[in-house]
């Protein structure tokens, strides 16, 4: 159990300090979900991690078209805090973010 907790803590520290990981919003049906943009793939696709509240390091990896992902101008610490606090405080952190849905979303 100690190794598992230690490994999760080390992973969290790596993600918080990783310059290549970008907080983002992912278009899901009629709304947005906070995500971590991990890397570009071929043909306009990207790899994202969708964290599950309230644990910022638990969730799912998804491969999506890049036009469904909107990078955010916030830090990883801020993005992880949104997840940890189950969205409370999002209004301040996401102030000024473009929340218009992509064309065809939710259709």
Segments predicted by a language model, with ranges:
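Membrane-targeting alpha-helical segments
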Residues: 1-4
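Glycine/threonine-rich ATP-lid/beta-loop region of ATP-binding domains
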Residues: 9-12
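Terminal membrane-proximal soluble interaction domains of membrane-associated proteins
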Residues: 16-107
């Amino acid at each position: 159990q100690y190794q598992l907790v230690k490994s999760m803590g080390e992973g969290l520290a790596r993600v918080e300090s990783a310059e290549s990981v970008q907080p983002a919003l992912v278009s899901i049906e009629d709304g947005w979900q906070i995500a971590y943009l991990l890397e570009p793939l071929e043909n306009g696709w990207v790899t994202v991690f969708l964290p599950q509240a309230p644990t910022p390091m638990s969730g799912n990896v998804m491969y999506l078209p890049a036009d469904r992902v909107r990078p955010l101008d916030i830090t990883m610490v801020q993005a992880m805090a949104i997840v940890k606090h189950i969205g409370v405080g999002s209004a301040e952190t996401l102030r000024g973010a473009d929340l218009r849905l992509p064309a065809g979303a939710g259709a």
